[in-house]
């Protein structure tokens, strides 16, 4: 119970701090604030479902400075349970230009699922480094530390994502990744090593002005099906969003 109260206070403080920075008059002349709202058929995180297959309302705000800093916060809730926050995320990032075509991004993220008992094992903090080629190809490495329960052995993940624009406002996206599972087997000598699983997605995107629609085919290897059971994502996930 103490851990839950601590995480709730920490999430509230970080969210308040990010919101203050976003809207502070000090940055009004030099920063850009953007946001988005949308509806998804399911919340999926690295190939695993962190919500039931039910409509999810999501909202996000981000602030970006000319020097490459970015602060963001987002939240999601099930339409059938609007009073419960299914997912909350806070992110701080810094971009560096490596050349005319390459960028590097370092990020620190905090995930919390306060009203989502199904995803309690996904509460975590992450540090990641990404290399980005012309907004087409992204390669990322992540270090993960769980913030819930008694098992805090560090995990790792690696992801490659691809995005290619097509005609008539369409584009295709694809991604593959490998990660250590967030649950480790428990034996007589304590927690063992986290197993490794693979995941991926292939999708089509239509965007026009502030509107965006996306349909993804999501997959994970059979090992994750045996280990996670009802946390296996639906094969198809759809999202429609509006940005401002």
Residue ranges and their predicted role:
Residues 46-55, 77-87, 114-123, 145-156, ...:
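Solvent-exposed loop/turn segments connecting transmembrane beta-strands
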Residues 41, 63-65, 94-96, 102, ...:
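Residue-level signature of outer-membrane beta-barrel architecture
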Residues 33-35, 55-61, 88-90, 104, ...:
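Hydrophobic, lipid-facing positions within transmembrane beta-strands of outer-membrane proteins
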Residues 202-211, 230-244:
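Outer-membrane beta-barrel "beta-signal"
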Residues 33-35, 67-73, 100-106, 135-141, ...:
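Repeated loop/turn-to-beta-strand initiation elements of outer-membrane beta-barrel proteins
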Residues 120-188:
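Detector for outer-membrane/organellar transmembrane beta-barrel domains
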Residues 39-45, 75-79, 110-114, 133-135, ...:
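Transmembrane beta-strands of outer-membrane beta-barrel pores
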Residues 28-79:
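Short glycine/proline- and aromatic-enriched beta-strand/turn motifs that initiate or cap beta-hairpins
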């Amino acid at each position: 119970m103490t851990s839950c109260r601590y995480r709730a206070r920490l999430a509230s403080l970080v969210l308040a701090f990010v919101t203050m920075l976003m809207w502070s008059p000090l940055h009004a002349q030099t920063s850009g604030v953007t946001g988005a709202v949308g509806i998804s058929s399911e919340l999926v995180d690295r190939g695993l479902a962190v919500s039931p297959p039910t409509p999810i309302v999501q909202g996000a705000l981000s602030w970006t400075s000319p020097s490459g800093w970015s602060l963001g916060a987002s939240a999601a809730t099930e339409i059938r349970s609007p009073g419960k926050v299914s997912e909350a995320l806070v992110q701080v990032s810094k971009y560096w230009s490596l050349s005319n075509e390459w960028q590097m991004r370092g990020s620190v993220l905090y995930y919390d699922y306060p009203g989502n008992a199904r995803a309690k094992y996904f509460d975590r903090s992450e540090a990641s480094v990404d290399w980005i080629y012309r907004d087409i190809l992204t390669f990322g490495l992540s270090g993960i530390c769980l913030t819930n329960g008694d098992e805090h052995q560090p995990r790792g993940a690696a992801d490659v994502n691809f995005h290619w624009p097509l005609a008539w406002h369409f584009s295709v996206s694809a991604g593959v990744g490998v990660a250590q599972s967030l649950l480790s087997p428990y034996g007589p000598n304590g927690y063992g090593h986290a197993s490794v699983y693979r995941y991926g997605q292939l999708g089509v995107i239509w965007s026009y002005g502030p509107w965006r629609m996306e349909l993804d085919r999501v997959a994970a290897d059979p090992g994750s099906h045996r280990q996670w059971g009802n946390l296996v994502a639906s094969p198809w996930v759809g999202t429609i969003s509006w940005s401002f």
